[in-house]
């Protein structure tokens, strides 16, 4: 168990470089339609199925808040939220939406947020769901570090590195423009700008074509449940469920498990999130260092640093033979940097508890 003082220390690490900046009318109606058309043309996996091989890896991205002795399973966190990528590695994969990714306005937002000289678009994704609960107590987006990036490393590891505060000199500066399209009058966005043990703030609903400029890798945050409760957990949802457009109906959407349609939505039912992310460089020297690989971390360096830090606090931790895939090791690291979860939630957006 961590002391209250150390939990407070960990909480204080998790503050973005600037508070979130609210935006309105982020995309044009034409851009929104084209972004949705890409979604309509594909079949998209659950977020949880794409990123997490086991419950320990998922829990490592959360902001704590689970009781001692809690034994998680992935099924406990199964919700009908799906993800796809519009762009990655600074490359847009769909020509019809290039203007939304190579976006000069967004680049100016990113540079201004950091007071930096340079920025480049890095990644763009969407999350989409119909009516859906939210069992997430609060989480961090996956940070990247020189040599250990979200593209080449497990999400859980990047999250723990960020929460530890031990690798700040290697942290790649990022800024996001996060935009929501949701008509739900009760579904907003909760975040903790001064750290998760301080007061929360909230982007008030409805959040249709509204957004924020943020550093989500160092900002504990959570989406909020949306839609009628009785439709939030479709019967038959599984890890192989897919989200796709209904053929011949541009505003029709399907959730399928195998060949079976388990739920249907209209566009107006959706909570549709578009996440645009840029790498930001304070000056040319930082740009060069990030690009030429001259000051990169290695996995050996990362695990050595983490293990030494944990042991220096009198916590026992084994040196694993396969640190990237050892559930017991992942749990031990997560416990060592677990500040206990957000201390408070907005009265209008309480946390949905996970049933054991």
Q: Where are the regions a protein language model picked out?
A:
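Glycine-rich, often proline-containing surface loops adjacent to acidic residues and nearby aromatics
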Residues: 15-19, 82-93, 121, 174, ...
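Catalytic core of non-heme Fe(II) oxygenases with the double-stranded beta-helix
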Residues: 111-121, 131-240
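Charged, glycine/proline-rich intrinsically disordered loops and linkers
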Residues: 50-80, 139-161, 226-261
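Non-heme Fe(II)-dependent double-stranded beta-helix
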Residues: 2-8, 30-113, 124-126, 133-136
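Catalytic core of Fe(II)/2-oxoglutarate
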Residues: 185-353
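Cationic-aromatic interfacial patches
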Residues: 5-16, 25
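A structural signal for short, well-ordered beta-strand segments
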Residues: 124, 177-179, 274-278
């Amino acid at each position: 168990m961590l002391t209250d003082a150390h939990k407070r220390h960990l909480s204080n690490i998790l503050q973005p470089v600037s508070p979130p900046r609210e935006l309105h009318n982020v995309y044009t109606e034409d851009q929104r339609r084209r972004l949705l058309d890409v979604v309509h043309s594909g079949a998209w996996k659950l977020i949880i199925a794409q990123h997490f091989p086991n419950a320990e890896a998922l829990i490592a991205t959360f902001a704590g808040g689970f009781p001692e002795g809690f034994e998680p399973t992935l099924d406990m966190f199964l919700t009908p939220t799906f993800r796809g990528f519009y762009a990655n590695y600074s490359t847009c994969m769909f020509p019809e939406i290039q203007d939304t990714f190579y976006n000069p306005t967004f680049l100016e937002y990113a540079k201004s947020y950091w007071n930096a000289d340079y920025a480049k678009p890095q990644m763009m994704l969407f999350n989409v769901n119909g009516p859906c609960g939210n069992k997430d107590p609060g989480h961090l987006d996956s940070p990247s570090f020189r040599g250990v990036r979200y593209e080449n490393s497990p999400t859980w590891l990047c999250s723990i590195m960020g929460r530890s505060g031990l690798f700040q000199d290697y942290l790649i500066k990022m800024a996001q423009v996060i935009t929501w399209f949701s008509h739900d009058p009760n579904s907003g966005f909760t975040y903790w700008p001064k750290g998760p043990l301080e007061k929360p703030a909230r982007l008030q609903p409805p959040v249709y074509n509204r957004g924020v400029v943020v550093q989500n890798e160092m900002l504990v945050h959570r989406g909020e449940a949306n839609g009628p409760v009785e439709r939030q957990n479709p019967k038959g949802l599984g890890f192989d469920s897919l989200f796709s457009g209904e053929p011949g109906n541009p505003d029709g959407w399907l959730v399928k498990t195998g060949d079976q349609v388990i739920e249907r939505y209209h566009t107006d039912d959706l909570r549709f999130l578009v996440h645009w992310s840029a790498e930001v460089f304070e000056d040319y020297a930082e740009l060069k260092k990030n690009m030429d690989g001259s000051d990169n971390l290695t996995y050996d360096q990362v695990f050595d640093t983490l293990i030494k830090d944990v042991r220096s606090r009198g916590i026992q931790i084994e040196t694993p033979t396969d640190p990237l895939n050892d559930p017991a090791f992942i749990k031990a690291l997560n416990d060592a940097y677990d500040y206990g979860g957000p201390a408070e939630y907005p009265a209008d957006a309480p946390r949905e508890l996970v049933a054991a």
